[in-house]
Every structure is written in C-alpha cells, then in structure tokens.
C-alpha cells in the first residue's frame, strides 16, 4: 500500500480520490492551479498537502506533464492518480511517471497507446470483429467532413473528442447547422481539456444505456 499519493486532477474526481485515500489511511497531496488554490475548494482543505502546479488555464497546470511529476517527486509521493480527463489517458505521462519511479494508477503506457485515443480504439475493436456504432472511419478535418458523415449515418449524431474523457469535447447534433457550430465548440473544448482538438463522429443512440467494461 502507498503511504502518500499525488492527485493530478481537480473537482469531483479529486474529491473522490482524497476521500478514498483517507479511508485507506493514505496521505494525499493535491496538485492545483493558481485559480483553484485561490478558490480553496473543500477537497483541497481535506488533503494532507496542496502544491501549485501552474497557472489558471488547464494548459498551464493540469496538462503540464513535467511540472506535475516534479511536484509529485518533491512531495515524496510514491504513487500518482490522474483521475479522469486531462492526462488520465496520456501514455507519455504514464511513461514519465514510471521513469521517475512513481506508480501511475491506471493502465501502463503500452496499453494506453492502443486504447487511450478513441479512434484507434474503435479501429482495434473493428479489427477484432466487434460491432461498433456507425460513424466516421477516422479523424474529421472540418465541419463539412462531419456533415457528410452525419448525413450518411443519419441525425442525430454526436461529435466526440478523440482524446476525450470526463464528458468533455462531446456535442449532440440534430442537423447540419448544429453540426457546424458543434464542431468548433467541441474542438475548442477538447484542445483546452486534453491538448488535442481532434474529433470523430458517431450515430447518437437515443435512449441508449452506457455500459463500461474494464479488463484488469
């Protein structure tokens, strides 16, 4: 069991990690942006320690691989939990943690390289003969490309961030006009949250149930 764990995220997921570690008697160190430090959220107060990992924007803090790993090392954390979104599915980040002797709570870098991005994961599923929701064959390079695929599979559709997680970079579209605006909005959000603006498209399943499977 780890003695001290670094929390490389914010908000609800960080609060859950801090709470779970407290129950397991594991010390937590939260990395926080300058804006979150100023807000002094309850989960930051509940953590054993808090360190600044950069500026207010996620790109200057929660997406800074080196800054986060160095903060974890300097606070003597032997493990790091990425939460969801941000760097949770970044294989370079997982590999960097390993290089510095920090246990990354999640899949190893090799597994992530296959499954971290949605489009390659979708391709791997199809190659294995698994059924997938109808949609684009790869990354969409423009709103016009999204509209072409949307009309092929039929509205409603959903635009998704290739590097998505935590519900970010996702937009439902019911017509061509919505798809045009949604493409810009989703790409901007994905770039801000993951440092990757790439999008793909799938048919939106109305009333569908989401079942997540983890293979350990």
How would you describe each model-predicted region?
Residues 1-216:
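N-terminal beta-alpha lobe that positions the nucleotide/phosphoryl donor
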């Amino acid at each position: 069991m780890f003695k001290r764990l670094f929390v490389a995220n914010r908000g609800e997921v960080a609060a859950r990690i801090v709470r779970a570690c407290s129950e397991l008697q594991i010390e937590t160190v939260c990395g926080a942006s300058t804006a979150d430090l100023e807000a002094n959220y309850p989960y930051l107060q509940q953590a054993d320690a808090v360190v600044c990992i950069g500026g207010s924007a996620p790109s200057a803090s929660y997406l800074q691989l080196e800054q986060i790993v160095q903060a974890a090392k300097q606070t003597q954390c032997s493990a790091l939990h990425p939460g969801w979104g941000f760097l949770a599915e970044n294989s370079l980040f997982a590999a960097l943690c390993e290089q510095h002797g920090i246990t990354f709570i999640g899949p190893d870098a090799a597994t992530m390289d296959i499954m971290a991005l949605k489009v390659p994961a979708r391709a791997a599923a199809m190659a294995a003969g698994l059924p997938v929701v109808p949609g684009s064959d790869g990354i969409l390079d423009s709103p016009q490309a999204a509209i072409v695929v949307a009309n092929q599979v039929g509205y409603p559709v959903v635009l998704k961030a290739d590097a998505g997680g935590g519900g970010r970079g996702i937009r439902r579209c019911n017509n061509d006009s919505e798809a045009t605006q949604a493409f810009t909005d989703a790409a901007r959000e994905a770039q801000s949250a993951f440092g990757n603006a790439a999008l793909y498209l799938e048919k939106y399943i109305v009333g569908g149930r989401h079942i997540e499977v983890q293979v350990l």
